[in-house]
């Protein structure tokens, strides 16, 4: 899959050096503008007015319980400024104390101008999953948790998830093991299930290049790394065809799992930039 640019691997706690850098170096800590390690696991990037915003899980060394989602910004994808803990642990509910919050994804809704955040919320034993919904009027502001994302009036009780925003402005929720849902015009609920990709694994991430849709996914090895693979389709509804691995066999996706593909604008072209997270070493 020659279109995929491997440029950014996000560690459990990843970040840039305090001095200005001009090169992304994978596999080592990065540091933000305050000299602190960039802490943004399971992340995504949103471009806004020529600036890049990185959203991820703010991890603690003491517990896997959700402490918040972080936001950093950069004008070069190398030097990062800490912006905010954009969503903190809630007093109660799906992201309350002793809950898990993972795989945060943010999109700007073209109809409303609102920023929509989706995430996997769960209990500490991963037996009470939800797809959660939070919103904000500004990209790096304080997001308000609205509750579970609903489909036909019911919560989506799934775990590994991703999002995709098509060039026509439509937003999609991607779910492990194959479901692809189109969001409503305001991105606050699910409108329809538009595809179900047979043979998919976990950690779904989608992009489009030259009119072809690509879906990346990982094998099922719990916390351990594996060789991720991909599917393609002429339209998001399918038919979807399994194509094989997108990294050399045995490299275990360079010790990462797909989390997001950022459409990086380079002159007149847009290059898919792979983002992977690490769960084990």
Question: What function would you assign to each model-found segment?
Answer:
Residues 1-20:
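Bacterial Sec-dependent N-terminal signal peptides
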Residues 19-281:
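Carbohydrate-active catalytic/glycan-binding domains of CAZyme proteins
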